[in-house]
Amino acid sequence: MFSKETYTNRRKVLQGLVEKGVIIFLSGNECPNNYPANTYYPFRPDSSYLYFFGIIRDGLAGVIDVESGEVALYGDDVDVADIVLTVPVESLASQAEKVGVKKTGTFQQFLDYIKAEQAKGRQIHFLPPHRHQEKLLLQDTLGIHHTKQTEAASIELIKAVVKMRSVKEEQEIAEIEKACEIGYKMHTAAMIAGKPGVTEKYVGAVVTGEAMKYGWQVSFPTILTMHGEIMHGGPQFKEIEDGRLVLCDAGCENENFYCSDHTRTFPANGKFTQQQREIYTIVEQCHD
């Protein structure tokens, strides 16, 4: 999380880029495995919500009233029944204060507020949703069928967010560089482990484990394969063959959800053949 001033300033800039209406950002929800409370998948907040509100927590909604300038965060505090499945969690009001938001409320209050503002004829700005929970929520709240929400999303808000997030702040660049440092270690680990006789699965696990050693996650499932001609080929239970080239496409996501994403190709036995080296050099020169 960045400073309170960072999020306050970002929201002020956004208000200046959208003419009128109410802007909403949803943090997203935990993803259950086999029953609702069994959510051991790592929670990943929506990136645009995170950019403007910063709190890493599921089930939140950030709201910006463009005309009045009022900003609010809505969500439900963790109750006694939930605490047995989680570590103690700060109240939403306490968390909101850290990102410069004074007004908070329950998630039901958010739903009631949005319905009331829509009934007044105000435009509700939202970005194209990509998670089914958010699609169903928008359908129930705004009356927009889930198959029509991409078209109904606010073009004005999309352009404003793209304009802001396309230019990285110094602190964001530092976060990306942190992720790239671990990404480098992931790829060198692949080159060390990726020898003839071991499986692609094994090397893929080594690469993924390199990110997890630092308490981070991979930014996407590791791609490691002798068949680089197949786009996004995941590692298989195939032994790496002597003389083959191995493609590794991998990266990590740090604790602030900034990512690295590198692709490298290396010879399994540590040495290029003459033909491999010539082709590799041509591709490298074209890239550079």
State where each predicted segment sits:
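Active-site neighborhoods and metal-handling regions in enzymes and metal-associated proteins
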Residues: 1-288
